Amino acid sequence: MRRRIVTAAGLGLAFLLTSCGLLSPSDEAGPGPRHGRASSLPSARPVPVGQGSRAAGDFNGDGHPDLVLDSLLAPAGGHDDDPGIGIVYGSAHGLDPATRELLTPARNAAPTGETVPAAFDAETSCDLDRDGFTDLVVTTDPPYDGVGRPPVPVQLLFGSPRGLGPARAVTLRIPDRARIGNEWPDQPVCGDFDGDGAADLAVTTSGPRISYLRGPFTRGGAPRAAGAPVAVPGTALATTTPLSPPPDIDHDGADDLLVRSADPGRRARSRLALGGPQGPTRAGTAYPPGYAVAFGRFAAAGRGPAPLTAVTADTDGLLSVAGRPGTIRTGTGGAPTLAAADVTADGRTDLALGGTRPALLLGSPDGLSPTPHRLALPRLPGTGRPLATVIALTDFDGDHHADLVLLTRRGPTHDRVTVYPGGPSGLAARPTRSFTTADFAAAGLSAS
């Protein structure tokens, strides 16, 4: 069973959110309050009480998307255990670092007997029980003696009018008939893969097969139905970028599942398993090798709307668009991360790329522009080039322009989360929100 330290799409994405604050973009990320530096967090406020909504990633149901951060920097003197998962709640004016929560294994994970998990990783999110509050899917490390079939490490945290903080996770119930072999169930991915309007889960099992769990789910973690494992064209699953919907390439009303030949974070070929009434059972389009795939309307529009296509990012941000290898060279450096959304509100999909030189590519009537618009990174102590990971690209403030959230890290002790608002000409030149995750963990308790 893999354990992610920094994730991009994936949720997943997920980063250890320990501090969210409003800072000048030029402020440096120091070693944390424990070294005498003022916290980058504002004083915490209670999470707003919501009534339920249809917004993606809305854990408290107030109609505004929220942000999940995993892979937090541990405070000085901390132990090796996972410091937790951070949530920054949204508002009518965008992400509000004052309304935040720290989810920890001790407070929020389901124990196995008397054993509390040490690992607590955010994987994906969707409204599993159809109550209007987004739920968070996490993976843990339950005890296992190596004999027989391992326990299920996937847990569900259900959203509520007060968010995720009050929740105690439940273990996902995967019927024996839906498992095969003795591999850990892993890499959960949300999507409506049968087109019935309820969120389903796909989870890896042994070999090129998945456990396909049909929603909605009970508060006890049980799916509505689950049959025998489903064969898919790969051995690993790739989630979409957090707050991005799963693709429906063939427009049949059922989401499609992206399958890889190697775990996320490794260079691999990928292919779609097309959804339908029986779930993601049909092999679909194959994509060139790379590290990440994003979906959008990237091709030239012609006389009608541009078709939904894929972009695959390879080393140094070399992009293959609509299956054409090496179409665009972006020079973003390293193994890139991706997110696609409409930043300029012109009806075309734009593409954000993470790396050592992150950039935005704008959509146009002729397709995705090959000209990268570089993003200014925060100053961080240390040596070497900082690496920026795309956390999310979505409209957080309701102005119809997608906003970008980056996590920039230099070494194991310094990072900065930055928010770049979208606008008619692209992303803002400088971030309007900036904080280090080390403060989030150091702050400990939330104000919920």
Describe each region flagged by the PLM.
Residues 2-448:
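Beta-propeller-forming repeat regions
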